[in-house]
């Protein structure tokens, strides 16, 4: 069996300097090559200290030659003898040509391996990560397993079960924390070149197989900043094969990726670019467990995915799945800062017959929602996006309680929304009669009275008449809120109604120096 030793590589290439005195001079001093052996323990210890400063773990055992070969369970990886370097079978199906950067290395062997749909490169990466989290050069020796992926397109690229159960491996993934930037930076400067491949960030190869070789799986790649961007670009601009592989790799991890700070972006992208069959599969996974779906909706990242899902669903099957899963969680969603956005999306992007479940629930709980911080938004959205009988029922419920809602910090916005839609003023303003003074002198309800003056010309005379009949009219002029109501009345009224109001205001000319009365007594308003 032919063996290659990284320590004997003759093709020396400069690696990037991380600011540690330029100690990364060539492949001979690359800290990521785990097969380097130093006879001088002091020199090795110094290098370990430098690595630790960079946040890279360093075990002194990797600098010494093992006394006996280390063997991995053949059931997981085949018979591999680890003695100065890994051995690989040159005849392995799907193995690609060794890259130019390793032209001077001896041939590579893997013995008795049968991956059954598992890409040999991710398997190799997993093995390296498990025993030496800083090693990656062996992994770079394999590239472009396109033929292998084509043969196994329906089988996900996955790690060995042996590695998935290895706690040490889980805690030492090469892309965790700050080390991913250092390792990827080292790769860019290691001398490896990909002349005909598109790049991401000007350095790394934008090729699915190459990227999976780095990260180990599409699922893990989606959780990394660089990897996530690369996946989105591949889905949007890559080949059909790339898109299909990414979809098959991610579909089983959609729920957890939806709540991941980075992974949620690739799920959103798939919802947009996938065909109807693939989109139906994603919707089915997300809605299969209603409680899980509600949890995603309440998550800061997950709510974006669900909103995107609602925006992109088109078929009756997809819409039915969304409705049946969201309906039981209405009250939970409407009381949450993330959840209420999902209900708003239902109202905005689903047709009236499909968002009916939201409107009916909003009508039933109208009194509670109107005075709630988030519920008031759902009610306003319901008013804007409903028609016919549903709209009439909702308007009737709000109008019945308009006096109380007008004085509420949140309810006043719901009443103003009704006024903006110019619904019949008969029922809406009926509760306001004999209460205009009370409403005009309050912070929230004063906005409602101003809105009535602007939107309902038929109500202006009645409101002004009630203001003029107030015995302490002078007090209204100096009131921090009522003075705005009087200003608005002077601006919108005409004829005899306005003339009576102007005459009453001029009687209190002594108040024109009052800070609240300055605008009322301005020539512009009084001479209009």
Swiss-Prot record:
Gene3D superfamilies: Leucine-rich Repeat Variant (1.25.10.10). GO terms for cellular component: cytoplasm. Residues 188-528 form the PUM-HD domain. SMART domains: Pumilio. One of its GO terms (molecular function) is RNA binding. It is found in: Cytoplasm. Pumilio repeats lie at residues 213-248, 249-284, 285-323, 325-360, 361-396, 397-433, 434-465, 466-503. It holds the Pfam family PUF. InterPro entries: ARM-like (IPR011989), ARM-type_fold (IPR016024), PUM-HD (IPR033133), Pumilio_RNA-bd (IPR033712), Pumilio_RNA-bd_rpt (IPR001313). The pumilio repeats mediate the association with RNA by packing together to form a right-handed superhelix that approximates a half donut. The number as well as the specific sequence of the repeats determine the specificity for target mRNAs. Sequence-specific RNA-binding protein that regulates translation and mRNA stability by binding the 3'-UTR of target mRNAs. This is Putative pumilio homolog 10. The lineage of its organism: Eukaryota, Viridiplantae, Streptophyta, Embryophyta, Tracheophyta. The gene is APUM10.
């Amino acid at each position: 069996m032919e063996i290659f030793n990284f320590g004997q590589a003759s093709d020396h290439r400069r690696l990037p300097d991380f600011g540690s005195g330029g100690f990364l001079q060539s492949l001979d001093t690359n800290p990521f090559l785990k097969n380097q052996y130093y006879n001088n323990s002091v020199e090795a210890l110094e290098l370990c200290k430098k690595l630790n400063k960079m946040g890279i773990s360093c075990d002194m055992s990797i600098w010494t030659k093992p006394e006996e070969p280390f063997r991995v369970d053949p059931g997981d990886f085949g018979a591999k003898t680890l003695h100065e370097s890994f051995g690989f079978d040159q005849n392995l199906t799907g193995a690609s040509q060794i890259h130019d950067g390793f032209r001077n290395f001896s041939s590579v062997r893997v013995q008795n391996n049968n991956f059954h749909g598992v890409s040999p490169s991710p398997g190799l990466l997993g093995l390296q990560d498990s025993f030496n989290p800083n090693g990656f050069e062996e992994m770079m020796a394999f590239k472009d397993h396109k033929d292998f992926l084509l043969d196994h397109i329906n089988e996900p690229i996955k790690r060995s079960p042996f590695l998935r159960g290895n706690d040490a491996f889980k805690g030492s993934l090469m892309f965790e924390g700050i080390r991913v930037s250092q390792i990827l930076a080292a790769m860019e400067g290691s001398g490896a070149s990909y002349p005909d491949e598109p790049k991401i960030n000007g350095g790394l190869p934008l090729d699915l197989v190459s990227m999976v070789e780095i990260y180990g799986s599409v699922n893990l790649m989606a959780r990394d900043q660089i990897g996530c961007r690369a996946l989105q670009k591949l889905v949007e601009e890559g080949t059909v094969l790339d898109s299909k592989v990414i979809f098959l790799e991610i579909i089983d991890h959609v729920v957890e990726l939806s709540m991941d700070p980075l992974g949620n972006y690739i799920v959103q992208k798939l919802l947009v670019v996938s065909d109807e069959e693939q989109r139906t599969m994603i919707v089915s996974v997300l809605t299969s467990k209603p409680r899980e779906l509600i949890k995603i909706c309440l998550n800061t990242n997950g709510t974006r995915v669900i909103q995107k899902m609602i925006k992109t669903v088109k078929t009756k099957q997809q819409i039915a799945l969304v409705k049946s899963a969201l309906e039981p969680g209405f009250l939970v969603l409407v009381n949450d800062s993330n959840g209420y956005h999902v209900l708003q999306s239902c109202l905005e992007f689903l047709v009236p017959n499909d968002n009916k479940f939201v409107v009916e629930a909003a009508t039933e709980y109208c009194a509670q929602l109107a005075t709630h911080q988030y519920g008031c938004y759902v009610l306003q959205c319901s008013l804007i996006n409903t028609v016919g009988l549903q709209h009439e029922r909702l308007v009737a419920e709000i109008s019945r309680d308009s006096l109380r809602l007008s004085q509420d910090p949140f309810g006043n916005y719901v009443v103003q929304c009704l006024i903006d839609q110019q619904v019949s003023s008969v029922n809406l303003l009926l509760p306001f009669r004999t209460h205009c003074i009370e409403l005009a002198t309050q912070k929230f309800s004063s906005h409602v009275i101003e809105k009535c003056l602007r939107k309902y010309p038929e109500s202006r005379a009645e409101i002004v008449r009630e203001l003029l009949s107030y015995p302490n009219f002078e007090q209204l002029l100096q009131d921090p809120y009522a003075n705005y109501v009087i200003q608005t009345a002077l601006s919108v009224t005409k004829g005899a109604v306005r003339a009576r109001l102007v005459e009453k205001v001029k009687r209190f000319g002594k108040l024109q120096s009052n800070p609240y009365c300055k605008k009322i007594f301005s020539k512009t308003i009084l001479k209009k």
